[in-house]
Regions:
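Secretory targeting and sorting signals
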Residues: 1-25
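Extracytoplasmic/secreted envelope proteins and their assembly/folding machinery
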Residues: 112-115, 119, 201, 221-224, ...
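Structural recognition of the beta-strand scaffold that forms the well-ordered cores
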Residues: 88-94, 134-137, 171-176, 200-206, ...
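The catalytic-center signature of Zn2+-dependent metalloproteases
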Residues: 216-288
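Active-site-proximal segment of zinc-dependent metalloprotease catalytic domains
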Residues: 162-235
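Propeptide-to-catalytic entry region of secreted or membrane-anchored zinc metalloproteases
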Residues: 26-171, 178-180, 303-307
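Second-shell loop/turn segments in exported
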Residues: 98-108, 212-217, 285-286
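Pan-zinc metallopeptidase signature
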Residues: 288-307
Length: 307
């Protein structure tokens, strides 16, 4: 097993009393964690579960593949530039404790709304670059299990996915549940997908889907952020001002941005912080874009690890 196990534990939430920046929840010691929003009075952060939260791996698997497969890499970049559509099959797995909405029984209308958010975000309809990906819902499974609904540990995650996972590396499995440890969501990177097998996929708190109860984080962008990780994107702030997201056209950012701090500039040179990027930690209404460089990386990661 490679030492670089990148579980993108999206959206670990820092429980705080206000919507201002502050201390973040303690991160797990094994693996790194994608820090996301708080489910208390306000949320902070939105992140990745990588080996280290603040330091992306120095050896990029996507770049390694690009060096070895130049022609395929060029074709992947061309797809991104043309917005040529690759359709990703999606399975939604609803984990609920009972038949009520409060018990996690997310209605089909909210799942369809989440699918629309994903398609709008990745096709550039919200104002960013078109990534060349679209998503097509294949089906919805519903599982009533009180123990699984409170998804608090890795053992449950494995059991759930072993029972419910559908398709291969090219299939996006999205699981909804009530996450513990102040989490909004998590995912595995494309470059780890083959190694982790059925664990591959995206998990989000059911209240983050459009129409959920998480206030400024209930427009569906938690899933967008985590699917970005599923395509092997890192946070815009990974590596700080040195840049560690392996994308040239995202401005350097010293630390995660919260809320929507317009004009924030934490690094000298390179422009203002990319607070509107889906791979930062800002609130849903603030983020609306991927960059062309991120689109190219996603296409290359797809060709390398999922196609």
């Amino acid at each position: 097993m490679r030492k670089r196990l990148l579980v993108v534990l999206g959206l670990v939430l820092a429980m705080v009393a206000t919507l201002q920046t502050g201390a973040q929840a303690k991160l797990p010691t094994s693996g790194g964690v994608c820090v996301e929003h708080d489910v208390g009075a306000g949320f902070e952060g939105r992140g990745t579960r990588v080996r280290d939260l603040v330091e992306a791996p120095k050896k990029d698997p996507v770049a390694k593949w690009v060096r070895r497969h130049g022609n395929q890499a060029d074709r992947a970049a061309d797809r991104a530039d043309r917005g040529q559509a690759i359709t990703v099959p999606v399975w939604f797995h609803v984990i609920r404790k009972d038949a009520t909405v409060a018990g996690g029984n997310v209605p089909a209308s909210r799942i369809n709304a989440q699918m629309q958010v994903l398609n709008d975000s990745f096709t550039g309809s919200t104002g960013g670059a078109s990534t060349g990906f679209r998503f097509e819902l294949q089906g919805i499974t519903r599982t009533t299990n009180k123990g699984w609904f409170n998804l608090t540990g890795g053992g449950k995650d494995r059991k759930i996915k072993q029972a419910l996972h559908r398709g291969g590396l090219e299939t996006l499995n999205i699981y909804t549940a009530k996450l513990g440890a102040n989490l909004l969501g998590y995912a595995y990177l494309a470059s780890d997908a083959e190694e982790v097998g059925v664990l591959d996929g995206v998990v989000v708190h059911f209240e983050t889907l459009p129409g959920g109860a998480f206030s400024i984080y209930s427009e569906g962008d938690t899933a967008t952020h985590e699917v970005g990780h599923w395509f092997d994107l890192y946070h815009t702030f990974d590596g700080g001002c040195d840049g560690g997201d392996f994308v040239d056209d995202t401005a350097p950012e010293a630390s995660p941005a919260f809320n929507c701090p317009v004009g924030r500039d934490t690094c000298v040179g390179g422009g203002v912080d990319p607070i509107t990027n889906f791979m930062d930690y800002t609130q849903d209404s603030c983020m609306f874009e991927f960059t062309r460089g991120q689109a190219v990386r996603m296409q290359q990661a797809w060709s390398a690890f999922r196609a």
